[in-house]
C-alpha cells in the first residue's frame, strides 16, 4: 500500500537547498520543518528558491530539546568537509568546523523523538576519520542500521567526477541492504550504456569574455589545468575554489575544435579558447534544476561557485533518498 502521509524533514547544513531539490526529484511528499545553515549567502539562495525555511543557526548549539521539538522522521546533513579534504589540514575532530557534527553525535542519544531515517554526505576520506568512527558508534548504539559507501556522479552516466562518502541509516531495521542497491533506482538501470556528454549541460549563447582564462594564468599555471571538450564524457570535481584556484578545483572547457589539445597548447594556447564553466553549467552538472535562481539575490556568480562547490549532487542524492525511504513505499 502506498504511503499518503507527508514526511517531516530536518535539513541540517542545508546550503542552497540541494537536499530539498533531491527530495523533490525523488518524488517524496515531504515538509521541510526547518533548514539550518550558518552561511548567510547560502540561506539567501535557499529562501529565494524555497520560501523562508532556512534559519541562520549554529548547529553546535542545538540541544536534544531542540531536536525533539522539530519531531522529524528524516534528518539530512552534509557536515563541513574541510576537516577531511585532501587539500585541507585534515585536523578531523580537532578542527573547530567539526564541532557542529560532533554536537549532533553527542546529543543524538538524548533525543526522545529519534528520526527513523538519516542521510549523511561528506567528502571521500571522511570514512577514515575519527569523526566517522564516532558516527558509526553513536548510530549503532542508538539502534540504527547503517550502510555506507563512496559514489560518484559518473557511475550514473553524469559526466562529472565527484566522489563522495554517503551514509544511510534506518532506525531498528533488521533487514539486509547495501549502498549498491541505489543503482536500481537510477536511470542507469533503464538506459544501460547511454553516456551523456559535457555538451548536454552547456549554455548555448552568451558573452563568454568574462569566462575566458587569462593568458597570464595559462602561461603560469596552464599545465595544471584539466582541459575538457564538449564531447568529453567526464570532467573534474568542481570545488569552492573554482576560478581562483587551479589544481583540483575543476575542469576548464576548450571551445575551439582543435583535435590535439596538448600539441596546440604548446604551440598557441590562446587559440584553444579556454574558458571556465559558468555557474549555471556547474549547477546543471550537479543536478540542480533550471529553476535554481540567484540573479535576484545579492549573491555574486563568484560566490555562487563557492556555494555550489560546497553542495551535493542532487541527482545522486535523490537516488539515495529513494533507497533510504524504500520501506515507506511512497
From Swiss-Prot:
InterPro entries xrefs: C5-MTase, C5_MeTfrase, C5_meth_CS, SAM-dependent_MTases_sf
Catalyzed chemical reaction(s): cytidine(38) in tRNA + S-adenosyl-L-methionine = 5-methylcytidine(38) in tRNA + S-adenosyl-L-homocysteine + H(+)
Primary location class: cytoplasm
Compartments where located: Cytoplasm; Nucleus
Pfam families associated with the record: DNA_methylase (PF00145)
EC number per UniProt: 2.1.1.204
Highest rank taxon of the organism: Eukaryota
Keyword field contains Nucleus: yes
GO molecular function, one term: tRNA binding
Function noted in UniProt: Specifically methylates cytosine 38 in the anticodon loop of tRNA(Asp). Can also methylate cytosine 38 in tRNA(Glu), albeit to a lower level, but not tRNA(Lys). Pmt1-dependent tRNA methylation is induced by nitrogen limitation and depends on the nutrient-sensing protein kinase sck2. Does not have DNA-methylation activity.
Name the UniProt record assigns to this protein: tRNA (cytosine(38)-C(5))-methyltransferase
Origin species: Schizosaccharomyces pombe (strain 972 / ATCC 24843) (Fission yeast)
Amino acid at each position: 500500500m502506498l504511503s499518503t502521509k507527508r514526511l517531516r524533514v530536518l535539513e541540517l547544513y542545508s546550503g542552497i537547498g540541494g537536499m530539498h531539490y533531491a527530495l523533490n526529484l525523488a518524488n517524496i511528499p515531504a515538509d521541510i520543518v526547518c533548514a539550518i545553515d550558518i552561511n548567510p549567502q547560502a540561506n539567501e539562495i535557499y529562501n529565494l528558491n524555497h520560501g523562508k525555511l532556512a534559519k541562520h543557526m549554529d548547529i553546535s548549539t542545538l540541544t536534544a530539546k531542540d531536536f525533539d521539538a522539530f519531531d522529524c522522521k528524516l534528518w539530512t546533513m552534509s557536515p563541513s568537509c574541510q576537516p577531511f579534504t585532501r587539500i585541507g589540514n585534515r585536523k578531523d575532530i580537532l578542527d573547530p568546523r567539526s564541532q557542529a557534527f560532533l554536537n549532533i553525535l553527542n546529543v543524538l542519544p538524548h533525543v526522545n523523538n529519534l528520526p527513523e531515517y538519516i542521510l549523511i554526505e561528506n567528502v571521500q576520506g571522511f570514512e577514515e576519520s575519527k569523526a566517522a568512527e564516532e558516527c558509526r558508534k553513536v548510530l549503532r548504539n542508538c539502534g540504527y542500521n547503517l550502510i555506507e559507501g563512496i559514489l560518484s556522479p559518473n557511475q550514473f552516466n553524469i559526466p562529472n567526477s565527484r566522489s563522495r562518502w554517503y551514509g544511510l541509516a534506518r532506525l531498528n531495521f533488521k533487514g539486509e541492504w547495501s549502498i549498491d542497491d541505489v543503482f536500481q533506482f537510477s536511470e542507469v538501470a533503464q538506459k544501460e550504456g547511454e553516456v551523456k556528454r559535457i555538451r548536454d549541460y552547456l549554455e548555448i549563447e552568451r558573452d563568454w569574455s568574462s569566462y575566458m582564462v587569462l593568458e597570464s594564468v595559462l602561461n603560469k599555471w596552464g599545465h595544471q589545468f584539466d582541459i575538457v571538450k564538449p564531447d568529453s564524457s567526464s570532467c573534474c570535481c568542481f570545488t569552492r575554489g573554482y576560478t581562483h584556484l587551479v589544481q583540483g578545483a575543476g575542469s576548464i572547457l576548450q571551445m575551439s575544435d582543435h583535435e590535439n589539445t596538448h600539441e596546440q597548447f604548446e604551440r598557441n594556447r590562446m587559440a584553444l579558447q579556454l574558458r571556465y564553466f559558468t555557474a549555471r553549467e556547474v549547477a546543471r552538472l550537479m543536478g540542480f534544476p533550471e529553476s535554481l535562481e540567484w540573479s535576484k539575490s545579492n549573491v555574486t556568480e563568484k560566490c555562487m561557485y563557492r556555494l555550489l562547490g560546497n553542495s551535493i549532487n542532487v541527482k545522486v542524492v535523490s537516488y539515495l533518498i529513494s533507497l533510504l525511504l524504500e520501506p515507506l513505499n511512497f
